[in-house]
Amino acid sequence: MDAERKKAEGTEKAVAEKGGRRRSAARDLCRIALFAAVIAVCAWISVPVGEIPVTLQTMGVCLAAAFLGWKRGTAAVAVYILLGLCGVPVFAGFTGGIAKLVLPTGGYIVGFLFTALIVGGASDAVGERIKNTWARAGILAAAMAVGITVCYAFGTGWFLALYRMSDRAMTLAGALSMCVVPYLLPDLVKIVAAVLIVSAMKKYVRK
């Protein structure tokens, strides 16, 4: 009888664990889809500035990574990018399609993945180990700044390469003046806003 009872208990435990894994996987998929949608909405909020509009995309990417961590945050960004490349109008200006990669903003799209990796990695590293709210906010803000800088690097490099391939004269200084300088202040504001949102809402989102 004891053996049968232990076997039954083991079976029940295995079934419960399997059900828990399924629920966890379903919850992860829902969160990934939700933040992919958040990034899309952020992309639609844009202000035309030269060839590269000011959008809230980077803030959406930072929020996804900060809330979900590097694995699921990067997955959310990847889903967003794949939807856009498949033609779903999730990019800035309600646009989509693989042709976006050969436009001046194509490098930023690739850079979003690395921004998510950096910010998500910092979020995972901080976890619950750092209790001080200001310290956590400072680490996240620094990670977002680094992540967006990496995105700048991809965007500027892509922009410069496209200009040179089209036989148009463009120096690195010129590319920086078009791809980075006009966006420094807006991105600083977005970092502050993202950190405030994460600090206020993190306790309601369990990883």
Positions of PLM-derived features:
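Hydrophobic residues within alpha-helical transmembrane segments
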Residues: 34, 78-82, 106, 114, ...
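Alpha-helical membrane-inserting segments
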Residues: 38, 42, 46, 64, ...
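Short hydrophobic/aromatic-rich motifs at helix boundaries and adjacent loops
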Residues: 31-36, 90-94, 169-170
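Hydrophobic transmembrane alpha-helices
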Residues: 2-76
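Membrane-embedded alpha-helical hairpins and interfacial helices in multi-pass inner-membrane proteins
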Residues: 94, 130-207
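Alpha-helical membrane segments and adjacent membrane-interface helices in multi-pass membrane proteins
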Residues: 43-121
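Residue-level signature of transmembrane alpha-helical entry/exit and packing/kink sites
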Residues: 24-35, 57-61, 73, 104, ...
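Short helix-perturbing small/polar motifs within transmembrane alpha-helices
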Residues: 4-6, 10-19, 34, 41, ...
